[in-house]
């Protein structure tokens, strides 16, 4: 396998490969660190991926880079088989100002906006398809393009009747749970959890693996509270630039529901309780 991969990459890079090292840690794509005489690059393979996943990632990285707000790996080359990215050496421990710097950078990213929510192409959230058809109404967009597709997949995967009853309550309340959401369509990373944040070897924040679209900035912020959360310094720095809006606690749960449903669909019924708890909090408020 490595000999064939080496040959294919040498043809794409048009230079001999000195080292080819597998990179662990990703749960979706196979990845390699590739060193030539001129550069070291990070290569993702299309093996095992759905069609269009690498292209969607490349487009998301391009969009984030356009904002100039936060560092992402530079896209060097995209082919049918490979996504070749800038290799960014990572530090083990973040410097003391890392989280506050990330908070400010995310707030600046969210200042980069367009008129309506959505994106010019569909993409993926993990391995799940993510619809991005633009609509002028954010609440409608989040229901039709975020919650409903995930819910329909969850039903197909056998989500229990107890969860269905809670979903029916949410349906009857909609769109009230997103009352007070921002009308500004901010540029969002889309999958901003701690596993998609790196510390470069010079201490700079780097974000990877985006699921980019434009929408309420709180959608990005809400995910940061799940799966371990971010440092308090991150939130303090973020809110110094973008103050927290009234009603965030309920909207936060709505935005988290999207990701919890996605985890149910990707990883199975161990996420049932988390989905039900989130639905319960939304519908009780």
List each model region and its residues.
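ATP/Mg2+ or Mg2+-diphosphate-binding catalytic cores
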Residues: 263-285
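Short helix/strand-capping connector loops at secondary-structure junctions
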Residues: 254-263
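An alpha-helical support segment within catalytic cores of ATP-dependent transferases
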Residues: 1-11, 114-187, 200, 281
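Conserved N-terminal boundary motif of the eukaryotic protein kinase catalytic domain
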Residues: 14-21
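ATP-binding pocket architecture of kinase catalytic cores
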Residues: 21-140
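Activation segment
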Residues: 48, 90, 148, 205, ...
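Active-site Asp-x-Gly
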Residues: 131-143, 152, 181-187, 194, ...
């Amino acid at each position: 396998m490595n000999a064939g991969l080496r040959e294919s990459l040498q043809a794409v890079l048009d230079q001999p490969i000195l080292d080819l090292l597998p990179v662990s840690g990703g749960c979706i794509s196979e990845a390699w660190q590739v060193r030539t005489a001129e550069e070291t690059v990070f290569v993702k393979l299309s093996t095992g991926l759905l069609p269009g996943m690498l292209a969607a990632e490349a487009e998301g990285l391009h969009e984030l880079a356009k904002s100039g707000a936060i560092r992402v790996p530079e896209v060097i080359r995209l082919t049918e088989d490979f996504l070749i990215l800038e290799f960014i050496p990572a530090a083990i421990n973040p410097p003391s100002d890392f989280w506050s710097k990330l908070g400010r950078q995310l707030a600046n990213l969210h200042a980069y906006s367009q008129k309506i929510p959505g994106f010019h192409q569909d993409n993926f959230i993990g391995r799940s398809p993510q619809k991005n058809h633009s609509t002028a109404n954010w609440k409608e967009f989040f229901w039709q393009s975020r919650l409903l597709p995930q819910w329909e997949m969850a039903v197909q995967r056998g989500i229990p009747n107890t969860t269905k009853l809670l979903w029916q309550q949410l349906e009857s309340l909609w769109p009230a749970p997103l009352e007070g959401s921002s009308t500004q369509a901010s540029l969002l990373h889309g999958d901003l959890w701690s596993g998609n944040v790196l510390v470069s070897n010079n201490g700079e924040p780097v974000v990877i693996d985006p699921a980019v679209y434009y929408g309420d900035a709180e959608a990005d912020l809400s995910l940061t509270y799940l799966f371990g959360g971010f440092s308090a310094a991150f939130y303090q720095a973020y809110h110094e630039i973008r103050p927290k809006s009234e009603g965030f606690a309920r909207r936060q749960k709505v935005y988290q529901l999207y990701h919890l449903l996605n985890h149910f669909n990707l990883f199975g019924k161990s996420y049932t309780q988390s989905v039900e708890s989130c639905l319960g909090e939304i519908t009780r408020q």
